[in-house]
A protein has these predicted regions:
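A short N-terminal interaction module
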Residues: 6-128, 234
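Extended basic-aromatic, gly/pro-enriched interface segments that bind polyanionic ligands
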Residues: 133, 154-235, 241-251
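Conserved SAM-binding loop of SAM-dependent methyltransferases across substrates and taxa
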Residues: 137-158
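Conserved class I S-adenosyl-L-methionine
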Residues: 173-175, 179, 235, 271-289
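A short glycine-rich, Lys/Arg-flanked "PGG" loop and its adjoining helix->strand segment in the class I
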Residues: 250-263
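PAS-family sensory modules
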Residues: 296-329
Length: 329
């Protein structure tokens, strides 16, 4: 609409004024927001209760404005009767922000400091296992695949094992797009001309990752906050996801990642994220890059992989490729 109703502006002012939206919102509106999140939890299985509520409510207000619902309670009624709007709101709350080689210096550090140590610790035939948690539409996973390939091609340091990059997200549309590996020209600005030429093919004005790069990455819908985690990971990247969560969920996620990592594994977070909530689990490798190593202490993770998760993981493994970096990688 051309003019957002005054009521929405008032609620936005309350939420953005000092960030304490729970205390400042009228109790009736606060209860309505909780009911909206409850609807999404029932439909999608994702609980946004411990996500940063200021961000969540801004997104809800945006959908209210688009649908010309002046009061939160009228939007709740509309939402209950409209499953499509529930799906749209859910996707809106996921806040996908990603890019190829975001923070380029971080990727340089991976090649200089992380990948050499991972390769050094590998026995002959032992796979390199990487998990990109919260991968959105795939740019981060493909960036890591390209970065790793460039490093291995340059050094010829790892020729006998398989490379397994697992990329997960709770958004089905995001995962579907990631699997295609197709991106518009504007989406590929983080790639060099050489990378674009070597690792992508042009299709109808867009660019698709080559099959060799796509085969390195296995994409799956997965919620690392509630689904059984993957294990024996050498490296986990979870960038710009934790910033949308309250400390309780951040600690839960970081504990899960500690459980998933090998004893000498690495964790990469976003520039505004930290492991300060669980200092006993991680040691800082690079403060600038928010790169951490796993401390060899017993974590607090309590969930064990189920038979279903082990089978799903096995199914994912069958899609990975054993490669020789110098030839058909």
């Amino acid at each position: 609409p051309e003019k957002i109703p005054q009521k929405l502006l008032e609620v936005v002012h309350i939420i953005t004024g000092n960030g304490h939206s729970e205390e400042e919102l009228p109790q009736q509106d606060a209860d309505v927001f909780k009911q909206i999140l409850s609807l999404l939890r029932i439909r999608k299985g994702t609980d946004f209760t411990y996500y940063k509520q200021t961000t969540i409510r801004r997104r809800i207000l945006r959908r209210m404005a688009i649908n010309k619902n002046e009061e939160p309670v009228t939007y709740l009624t509309f939402l209950r009767e409209n499953k499509t709007e529930q799906d749209v709101l859910y996707q809106d709350l996921l806040i996908p922000v990603t890019a190829f080689f975001r923070d380029l210096k971080t990727f340089d550090n991976l090649c200089e400091s992380v990948f050499p140590l991972i390769v050094k610790n590998k026995l002959p035939g032992e796979p390199i296992r990487i998990w990109v948690a919260g991968c959105s539409t795939g740019e981060e996973a493909y960036s890591i695949a390209i970065c790793l390939k460039e490093y291995l091609d340059k050094t010829s340091a790892y020729t006998t094992g398989s490379l397994q990059i697992f990329a997960t997200d709770i958004s089905e549309p995001a995962i579907a797009k990631a699997r295609t590996g197709i991106y518009t020209k504007s989406n590929t600005t983080g790639l060099t001309a050489q990378q674009l030429q070597e690792f992508f093919i042009k299709i109808n004005g867009s660019y698709q990752a080559t099959k060799s790069i796509r085969d390195m990455c296995v994409f799956a819908v997965h919620n690392f906050l509630k689904d059984p985690p993957f294990g024996k990971m050498d490296f986990i990247s979870c960038r710009n996801v934790l910033i949308y969560m309250e400390p309780y969920l951040q600690k839960k996620a970081l504990t899960t990642f500690h459980y998933s990592l090998n004893p000498k594994g690495f964790l990469l977070l976003g520039k505004s994220e930290t492991t300060s909530g669980v200092p006993e689990l991680y040691a800082s490798v690079s403060k600038a890059d928010k790169l951490y190593s796993r401390k060899d202490v017993q974590g607090r993770f309590f969930q064990t992989p189920t038979l279903r998760s082990e089978q799903s993981f096995s199914d994912m493994n069958t899609n990975t490729k054993t490669v020789n970096p110098k030839t058909d990688f």
